[in-house]
Amino acid sequence: MTNIRKTHPLLKIVNHSLIDLPAPSNISAWWNFGSLLGLCLMIQILTGLFLAMHYTSDTATAFSSVTHICRDVNYGWLIRYLHANGASMFFICLYMHVGRGIYYGSYTYLETWNIGIILLFAVMATAFMGYVLPWGQMSFWGATVITNLLSAIPYIGTTLVEWIWGGFSVDKATLTRFFAFHFILPFIIAALVMIHLLFLHETGSNNPSGIPSNSDKIPFHPYYTIKDALGFLMLILLLMLLVLFSPDLLGDPDNYTPANPLNTPPHIKPEWYFLFAYAILRSIPNKLGGVLALVMSILILAIIPFLHMSKQRSMMFRPISQVLFWILVADLLTLTWIGGQPVEHPFITIGQVASILYFSIILILMPLASLVENKILKW
């Protein structure tokens, strides 16, 4: 008799995705981040659900309800900080996952890559709206500044912003709708993850060499289930270190002050994982130009597959592209640092140079390096 996991209509989907899935024999730890992102999403949905049981999305009580969660709810402080720092872990894994895709040429799986970009936007939107919910100073002013960017859209901008706000400023209506969207989006993300995996399993995983591995596959279980389990353990360890020893390390102290529309904080800045995009936005003196650069800083990922000029898929055997890739990583770290600095000399100039370098590497230098490497192959 055939095993039930191979015959049962539901179980066989799980079987083909997580157990009997043929996987390349040489995928490295960089391939762990997909499953780690799944773990992060589950942690966020679970902790978020328990937070939503005690949270109230009203401007008068939102801040107090978060205080109540931390002080009065059993292990409420733990749930709250797991959720807040879980978001940071989520973005660390996301950026590693995208970086892996760029380095090893995984973007040639177009459908998988494009769904991934949609997922990235959805997670960023969810994180932004979640940051507004505690209704602290940075929540309020962050929401005001970022939603205001849409007013740069010609003709319909101002109307659009007021429509999103549900009034003439960020107020009760805004908070309530942000809570509703923040609750529903993770489930939409979970559905998109299924589609992401569906497209991935049409082709099978890429591998570090970038060479088809059809002749050398191994079953996902037990080899990669145990490898993923190790990744889970390391992620949870890191998250717990953060939550239990310095839960406010990545947060902003301004968010412990209740929102006050009459008092603007000296430095309005988003959470650390948006700082690179914020730096690109600020480095352009024109409002619409800045907004376009902000959107393009992420949307540029959609152009990457069409800029692939190399005869090889992966960067494993392409030293010039490797150097450019790591300069790009350093550039993103520089932008992240600049995004958290005040708008004054020399930070303005550093930000502008780093922004130009970011777009130049992706749009010009990497394709050129690929063409040079193609020539070197013939020597």
From Swiss-Prot:
MF-aspect GO terms: metal ion binding; ubiquinol-cytochrome-c reductase activity
Membrane topology classification: Multi-pass membrane protein
Cofactor: heme b
Subcellular location: Mitochondrion inner membrane
Single GO biological process annotation from the record: mitochondrial electron transport, ubiquinol to cytochrome c
Keyword Plastid: no
Matching InterPro entries: Cyt_b/b6_C, Cyt_b/b6_C_sf, Cyt_b/b6_N, Cytb/b6-like_sf, Cytochrome_b, Cytochrome_b_C_euk/bac, Cytochrome_b_N_euk/bac, Di-haem_cyt_TM
Assembly description: The cytochrome bc1 complex contains 11 subunits: 3 respiratory subunits (MT-CYB, CYC1 and UQCRFS1), 2 core proteins (UQCRC1 and UQCRC2) and 6 low-molecular weight proteins (UQCRH/QCR6, UQCRB/QCR7, UQCRQ/QCR8, UQCR10/QCR9, UQCR11/QCR10 and a cleavage product of UQCRFS1). This cytochrome bc1 complex then forms a dimer.
Protein family per UniProt: Belongs to the cytochrome b family.
Function: Component of the ubiquinol-cytochrome c reductase complex (complex III or cytochrome b-c1 complex) that is part of the mitochondrial respiratory chain. The b-c1 complex mediates electron transfer from ubiquinol to cytochrome c. Contributes to the generation of a proton gradient across the mitochondrial membrane that is then used for ATP synthesis.
PANTHER family, sorted: CYTOCHROME B (PTHR19271:SF16)
Note: Heme 1 (or BL or b562) is low-potential and absorbs at about 562 nm, and heme 2 (or BH or b566) is high-potential and absorbs at about 566 nm.
Name of the protein described by the UniProt record: Cytochrome b
Organism from which the protein derives: Lepus europaeus
